[in-house]
């Protein structure tokens, strides 16, 4: 009995323990099935409800215990898998919870892991005959448990959809009754959460040719080894065979270790980098080897790896399309071959591949990588409200959205997802179409654009209106007697109800500006005038309008006085009066036309005669040696901005010539004499266009393209010679052409030359000019060429002349020289001095390591020291002081508009590349591109440019120098915010951290709001000179 009781008690205790274990082993969180993109990480969560016992967790994969490593590890009770691999990690995962006290174990339900990947796509031909063409898009990839693969078909880059004889059936493309309009290259794209790929090869269909290239239909049959080269061979009637000339393979030890892998998905605006690790053997380092990056088969960036210096302008594949455009966002690192993007934009999406090219050998290609850009969801453009004309047959409201993936566009009315009204539909492009517009179509319509990023909306108001029309228009002319009464009718219909406004001689009439006792405005729009006066005579206009538009009708009121004998019975003579008035008017008009034509012919004859006399006189004075520069040229007849050229040089006239010209001067205005003077100045600057060579476009400015090229050294005149020639001509004009004045001319030339120097350093100025003369003994001079393309834009022409006069009037080593002006034909070229190191901003970025400028056998330049920065700022101050002393203003002073040479000589220049290269540094304000972050407040508010505003910009330039030009001034603010704060006087400036203490106060004074309190360039130069001396100590 006792034993039986003991067994019963043991059974009860076991049941109780089992119940406790069952309750304690229930899971609070169980692992969930997941689908993840390959190479991404995943986490399985597992947690038991038993918080009183010590538990141990294990994980099983497909029934086997997991061996943990760095990639697959357990944190607490959760399982973490880094860089998921589809070949190893796919399957079921089970969490095992073990009670260490009792040894009881509990298993969670299995969780399935599916891997999403996308490798490649190819087009396969399933069948082709006259009645049907059947293609299949074969994809190597999987979408897991998410949405299936999305397949898109393209013909010659045009996206196809089910239409007419084209049918899309899952992965297949069916074209029934194919014809010549279906000819082209067919390719397909596949996309899922892992990205998007396009078939590397396509299928070419051509209905009119019997020999068609065919894709292989067996998987083991090889395509071309190079994915970016496709050659289809077709033997013609003559039996000729096409082929490619093979190049020898590169050495095996020259190879690419790692290229861009798989597919990268980057959000718009984020930075990224593409890897290209390579091995370069020592025996090949002295040979020509190029590292290239290609995008969609086109050359994007390249760099020389070998020791041999590259030939300028030469490339191994110069005949191929290239995308070698200057873009500060893209940097190719020579050391490791990485292609880095500072910020991604939508156009960067594509297929990238790096390549090693040994001269005269076949290229070595890496595996291609796909860069997909997630474009921000936005409307392009924003939908706007619209007025629709009642009973219009068709009216459209557009709604276009962009984003990644492609957004779906739909319309709803009044914020509710209800059915649109009758005769309103939405086409495939998201356009809202109204047919047979009626009043029921009024309301608020919302456009919804949706993709995986979310949803955006824009609401527009649709109003149905009726264009105003005259139901009773004013009819005239109206004649009335003085002190009579006249009624001018004007009634209108429309929806909304039109308003009616009267005016007299284009001046609005209302009860406030008229005599209320005589003028009466009726509710229906009629104007009644009582007790008509003589001054009431004139042209009266009635304007009707509503939100749909405006219309106007005029009526003439004629007031007859009592003395004119106006009476109703005399109206029969009105016909004769009208006829006489018409005859008189026509006679006067004909006489005026004859007079104008006669004056035009006379002026043209006088101008040609005067031009002939000037040409003859110039030829005689030059001894017959001067060629006809532009007198007979076609280009000079069509110069819209600059004064026309004249033959030879303007010199002194003899007394008889002056008497012959005296009569012409009486017919010429002061403006024509000024035009002759400017023409003489431009003629001195004339350069033949044939002297320019190797022009390379580096950007676009406000009035045209900007180039860098070379100028024959024989055409470069030293500044001293130019000044002496000019001074000699002025002396001859004043003192006559006799030889006795040569001594005084030379003396005055030297004195004028010394006076033209700035007061900072005359001795260094003379040395600089002597060095320039010595340098001109070479064959060619590096120059900057600015083209005047906008010849019909008066503002652009005026700015072109201003820059020309500015650089012509200054001879200083701190300002670039003006070599000349090419005016033989359009466009005109302004030829300026340029340096071997280019613009200062790019130099600063290179020394800061932001731009890769390393060439073969060299390294990146080191950052500038404080002494070097002060030397650069001092030279710019000297150049700006020279501009100030010549009574000019620069208006666009910045590091981008200065140049630096390999001798560390800095000069103030004027490239002004505001349209592409430095477009971020300009903002369109009042219909003009302005460097608002460098402008003083008075320039933005009142368009007032002075030397003090140049000093304001100079302070910003020094700020750029100490920051190595790595960031924009106030880059945390938008352009609109900078303009608003500058106009409000709330834009705060502070000097750079590396600025010496001795310069902080004077630099801060450059930015004070009162221009009179800003320092001068001479004061800034003196402060910089002291700072340089202190830095040297």
From Swiss-Prot:
Identification of the protein by name: Tyrosine-protein kinase-like otk
Polar residues composition-biased segments: 655-673
Expression across tissues: Dynamically expressed during embryogenesis in several areas of the developing nervous system, including neurons and fasciculating axons. Expression in stage 7 embryos is seen in the anterior midgut primordia, cephalic furrow and along the germinal band. At stage 11, expression is in 15 stripes over the trunk region, and in the anterior and posterior midgut primordia. Stage 12 shows expression in the developing nervous system, procephalic lobe and maxillar bud. Stage 13 shows expression in the ventral cord, maxillar segment and in three regions of the gut.
Disruption phenotype: Axon guidance defects. R-cell differentiation and cell fate determination are normal, but many R1-R6 axons connect abnormally to medulla instead of innervating lamina.
Residue numbers spanned by region Disordered: 617-679, 718-760
Membrane-spanning intervals of the chain: 582-602
Signal peptide interval: 1-22
GO biological process, alphabetically ordered: axon guidance; cell adhesion; dendrite self-avoidance; homophilic cell adhesion via plasma membrane adhesion molecules; imaginal disc-derived female genitalia morphogenesis; imaginal disc-derived male genitalia morphogenesis; internal genitalia morphogenesis; negative regulation of canonical Wnt signaling pathway
S-S pairs: 46-95, 137-188, 276-354, 399-447, 490-542
Gene Ontology CC terms: axon; membrane; plasma membrane
Location in the cell: Cell membrane
């Amino acid at each position: 009995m006792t034993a039986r009781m003991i067994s019963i008690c043991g059974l009860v205790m076991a049941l109780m323990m089992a119940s406790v274990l069952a309750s304690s082993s229930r899971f609070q969180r169980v692992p969930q099935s997941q689908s993840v993109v390959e190479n991404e990480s995943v986490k399985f969560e597992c947690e038991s409800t038993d918080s009183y016992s010590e538990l141990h967790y294990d994980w099983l994969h497909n029934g086997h215990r997991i061996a943990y490593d760095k990639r697959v590890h357990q944190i607490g009770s959760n399982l973490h898998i880094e860089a998921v691999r589809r070949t190893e990690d796919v399957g079921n995962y089970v969490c095992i919870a073990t009670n260490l006290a009792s040894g009881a174990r509990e298993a969670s339900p299995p969780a399935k892991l599916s891997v999403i990947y996308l490798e490649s796509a190819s087009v396969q031909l399933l069948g082709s005959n006259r009645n049907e063409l059947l293609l299949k898009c074969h994809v190597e990839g999987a979408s897991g448990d998410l949405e299936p693969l999305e397949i898109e078909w393209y013909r010659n880059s045009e996206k196809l959809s089910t239409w007419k004889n084209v049918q899309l059936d899952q992965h297949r493309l069916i074209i029934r009754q194919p014809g010549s309009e279906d000819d082209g290259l067919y390719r397909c794209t596949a996309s899922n959460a892992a990205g998007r790929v396009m078939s590397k090869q396509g299928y070419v269909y051509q209905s009119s040719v019997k020999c068609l290239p065919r894709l292989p239909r067996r998987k083991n049959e090889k395509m071309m080894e190079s994915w970016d080269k496709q050659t289809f061979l077709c033997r013609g009637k003559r039996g000729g065979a096409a082929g490619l000339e093979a190049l020898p393979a590169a050495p095996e030890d020259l190879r690419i270790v790692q290229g861009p892998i798989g597919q990268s998905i980057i959000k718009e605006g984020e930075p990224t980098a593409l890897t290209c690790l390579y091995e370069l053997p020592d025996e090949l380092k002295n040979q020509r080897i190029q590292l290239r990056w290609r995008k969609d088969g086109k050359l994007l960036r390249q760099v020389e790896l070998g020791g041999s210096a590259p030939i300028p302008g030469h490339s191994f594949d110069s005949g191929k399309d290239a995308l070698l455009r200057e873009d500060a966002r893209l940097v190719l690192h020579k050391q490791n071959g990485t292609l880095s993007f500072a910020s991604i934009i939508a156009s960067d999406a594509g297929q990238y591949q790096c390549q090693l090219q040994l001269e005269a050998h076949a290229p070595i290609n890496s595996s291609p990588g796909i860069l997909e850009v997630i474009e921000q969801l936005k409307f392009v453009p924003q939908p706007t409200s619209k007025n629709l004309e009642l009973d219009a047959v068709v009216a459209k409201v557009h709604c276009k959205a962009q984003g990644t993936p492609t957004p779906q566009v739909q319309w709803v009315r009044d914020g509710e997802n209800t059915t649109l009204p009758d005769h309103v539909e939405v086409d495939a492009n998201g356009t809202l179409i109204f047919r047979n517009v009626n009043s029921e179509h009024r309301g608020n319509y919302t456009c919804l654009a949706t993709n995986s990023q979310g949803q955006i909306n824009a609401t527009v108001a649709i109003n149905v209106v009726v264009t105003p029309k005259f139901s009773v228009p004013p009819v005239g002319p109206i004649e009335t007697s003085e002190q009579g009464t006249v009624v001018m009718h004007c009634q209108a219909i429309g929806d909304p109800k039109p308003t009616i406004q009267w005016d007299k001689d284009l001046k609005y009439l209302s009860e406030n500006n008229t005599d209320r006792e005589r003028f009466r405005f009726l509710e229906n729009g009629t104007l009644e005038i009582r007790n008509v006066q003589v001054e009431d005579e004139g042209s009266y206009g009635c304007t009707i309008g509503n939100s749909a538009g405006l219309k106007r009708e005029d009526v003439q009121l004629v007031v007859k006085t009592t003395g004119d004998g106006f009476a109703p019975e005399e109206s029969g003579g009105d016909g004769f009066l009208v006829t006489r008035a018409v005859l008189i008017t026509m006679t006067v008009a004909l006489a005026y036309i004859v007079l104008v034509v006669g004056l035009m012919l006379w002026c043209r004859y006088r101008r040609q005669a005067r031009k002939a006399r000037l040409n003859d006189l110039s030829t005689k004075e030059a001894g017959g040696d001067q060629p006809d520069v532009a007198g007979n040229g076609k280009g000079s007849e069509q110069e819209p901005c600059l004064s026309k050229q004249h033959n030879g040089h303007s010199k002194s006239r003899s007394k008889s010539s002056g008497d012959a010209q005296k009569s012409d001067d009486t017919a010429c205005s002061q403006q024509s004499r000024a035009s002759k003077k400017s023409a003489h100045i431009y003629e001195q600057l004339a350069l033949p266009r044939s002297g320019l060579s190797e022009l390379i476009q580096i950007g676009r400015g406000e009035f045209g393209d900007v180039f860098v090229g070379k100028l024959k050294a024989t055409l470069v005149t030293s500044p001293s010679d130019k000044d002496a020639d000019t001074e000699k001509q002025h002396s001859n004009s004043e003192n006559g052409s006799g030889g006795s004045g040569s001594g005084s001319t030379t003396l005055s030339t030297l004195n004028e030359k010394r006076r033209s120097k700035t007061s900072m350093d005359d001795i260094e100025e003379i040395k600089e000019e002597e060095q320039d003369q010595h340098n001109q003994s070479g064959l060619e001079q590096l120059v900057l060429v600015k083209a005047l393309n906008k010849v019909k834009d008066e503002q652009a022409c005026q700015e072109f002349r201003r820059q020309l006069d500015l650089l012509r009037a200054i001879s200083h080593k701190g300002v670039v020289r003006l070599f000349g002006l090419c005016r033989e034909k359009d466009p005109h070229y302004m030829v300026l001095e340029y340096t071997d190191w280019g613009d200062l901003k790019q130099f600063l970025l290179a020394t800061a390591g932001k731009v890769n400028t390393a060439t073969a056998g060299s390294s990146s330049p080191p950052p500038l020291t404080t002494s070097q920065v002060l030397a650069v700022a001092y030279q710019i101050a000297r150049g700006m002081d020279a501009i100030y002393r010549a009574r000019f203003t620069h208006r666009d002073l910045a590091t981008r508009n200065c140049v630096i040479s390999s001798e560390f000589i800095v000069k103030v220049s004027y490239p002004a590349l505001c349209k592409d290269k430095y477009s971020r540094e300009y903002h369109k304000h009042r219909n003009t591109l302005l460097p608002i972050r460098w402008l003083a407040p008075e320039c933005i508010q009142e368009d007032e440019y002075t030397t003090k505003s140049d000093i304001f910009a100079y302070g910003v330039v020094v700020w750029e120098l100490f920051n190595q030009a790595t960031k924009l001034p106030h880059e945390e603010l938008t352009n609109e915010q900078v303009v608003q704060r500058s106009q409000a006087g709330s834009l705060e400036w502070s000097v750079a951290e590396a600025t010496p203490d001795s310069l902080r106060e004077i630099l801060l004074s450059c930015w004070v709001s009162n221009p009179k309190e800003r320092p001068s360039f001479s004061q800034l130069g003196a402060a910089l000179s002291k700072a340089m001396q202190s830095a040297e100590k």
